[in-house]
């Protein structure tokens, strides 16, 4: 694993009272580098399956009952408001307008993406065979062998590239683009309550200097925080 990934796992372990060990969680910034770089295929399989099955294990964190209740309540809500289903209710205010338009778009993407995905799978299987693997490509192999293939074909290493994109500079770049395209400006605010000490707040103004809103920058995953 890259040194940065190992250091992050050590920090997570320390935060959980396991100093001297390494902890990988099911949050994307932790699991995705593991799937991308870890040589141990059995561990990749374990963490991938844990990620896919999260919230559906036979324990106190099983969400099946909660999800069933949410789906039922959403159907009731949609029908009370005069819609045949929840998708129609949600899409009524969106550009797509209805489920049929969404399915048409998804199908167009699917038709274009599927042949490319199959070609990528064939290339990854060749890489597995070439490096002595005696198994068929599985979901937990995809990122790992895609990384190897990328290095072989293009000489690219994401870990080496990432050092040229520190968070602050990436944020400045995003603000610069927003200003050039839309005239937006961002001014950091130090007098607002924040959800976490690492979070930042920025006032957003339009090209005329008119207040538009507040942008909260809270980039890092942590326990209890929703992703996305």
Give the location of each predicted region:
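C-terminal catalytic core of Y-nucleophile DNA break-rejoin enzymes
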Residues: 31-33
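Short, charge-rich amphipathic alpha-helices with coiled-coil/heptad character
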Residues: 37-54
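Amphipathic coiled-coil alpha-helices
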Residues: 66-67, 73
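A short, flexible low-complexity segment enriched in Lys/Arg and Gly/Pro that occurs
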Residues: 49-66
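Short hydrophobic/aromatic-rich motifs at helix boundaries and adjacent loops
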Residues: 45-49, 58, 95, 146-149
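A conserved non-catalytic segment of reverse transcriptases
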Residues: 27-29
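Generic structural signal for well-ordered, non-membrane alpha-helices
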Residues: 45, 72-75
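Active-site-proximal, well-structured secondary-structure segments within enzyme catalytic domains
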Residues: 1-25, 36, 73, 79-228
């Amino acid at each position: 694993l890259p040194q940065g990934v190992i250091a992050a796992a050590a920090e997570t372990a320390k935060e959980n009272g396991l100093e001297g060990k390494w902890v990988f969680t099911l949050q994307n910034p932790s699991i995705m580098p593991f799937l991308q770089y870890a040589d141990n295929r059995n561990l990749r399989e374990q963490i991938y399956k844990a990620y896919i099955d999260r919230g559906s294990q036979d324990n106190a964190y099983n969400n099946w009952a909660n999800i069933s209740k949410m789906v039922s309540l959403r159907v009731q809500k949609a029908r009370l408001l005069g819609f045949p289903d929840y998708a129609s209710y949600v899409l009524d205010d969106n550009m797509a307008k209805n489920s049929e338009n969404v399915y048409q778009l998804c199908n167009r993407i699917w038709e274009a993406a599927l042949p490319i995905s199959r070609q990528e799978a064939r290339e990854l299987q060749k890489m597995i065979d070439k490096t002595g693997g005696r198994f068929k490509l599985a979901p937990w192999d995809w990122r790992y062998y895609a990384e190897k293939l990328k290095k072989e074909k293009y000489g690219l290493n994401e870990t080496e590239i990432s050092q040229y994109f520190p968070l602050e500079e990436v944020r400045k770049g995003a603000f610069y683009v927003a200003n050039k395209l839309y005239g937006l400006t961002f001014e950091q605010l130090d007098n607002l309550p924040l959800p976490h000490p690492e979070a930042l707040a920025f006032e957003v103004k339009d090209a005329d200097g008119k207040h538009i809103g507040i942008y909260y920058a809270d980039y890092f995953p942590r326990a209890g925080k929703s992703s996305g």
